[in-house]
Amino acid sequence: MKKPAANIKYRILSVLSVISVLFIWELVTDILHLISPMMLPSPAKVLNTFIYKLCGGVNPDGATLLQHIAASMKIALGGYVVGVIIGVPLGIAMAWNRKFEMFAKPLFDIIRPIPALAWIPLMILWLGIGYWSKVGIIFFAAFISATINSYAGIKRTSQVHLWVASTFGATNMQMLFKVAIPTALPMIFTGLRLALG
């Protein structure tokens, strides 16, 4: 019985804290005029502008807020999907095949520490200012995270599981697809989640 009461109290306090912040914000900006509306518009003004832009209000470029959101999602998902499609198989291949790891990992380790934002000048030089340069920057962020976690997940596969599979006559590909990848899925999905950030 104590848990539901505590839960309700927590929800009430959460709502009250948000309402308090909004009230103080409105008080400071619109009622007492302590802060210029140019510096910090009131919550009512922000809400009115949001609704206006959402419902097709006139923007300088003629697009609605939903059109801007759709354009941003197209760029973000484009880079993310390509980064994951290349990064996950690369990480798995590097972790599973020693010869491929010796070839690819040094090259990957060169670009791995470079932050995604550092690629901006190169992307602009290579791809211009437009859709593809933005996708390229997001691609690198997603690619690095997906590759690292896929690699780590396969490397953490229990050797005992691989020995058991080998004892039962599993081929190299069967061990990869039936043992290593299922074991690595939590790490791979963590990489996919981090790649979204």
Language-model regions: role of each:
Residues A71, I75-G83, L117-P121, P182, ...:
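Hydrophobic alpha-helical transmembrane segments in multi-pass membrane proteins
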Residues L65-I69, M73, F103-A104, I110, ...:
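Hydrophobic alpha-helical elements at and bordering transmembrane segments
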Residues M1-I19:
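Transmembrane alpha-helical segments of polytopic membrane transport and secretion proteins
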Residues D109-S145, A152-G153:
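Generic hydrophobic transmembrane alpha-helix motif, especially the helices
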Residues I31-V81:
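Periplasmic/extracellular loop-to-transmembrane helix junction in inner-membrane transport proteins
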Residues G136-F140, M173-G197:
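Transmembrane alpha-helices
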Residues K155-S166, M173-K178:
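Intracellular coupling helices
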Residues G78-F108:
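Transmembrane-helix boundary motif in ABC transporter permease subunits
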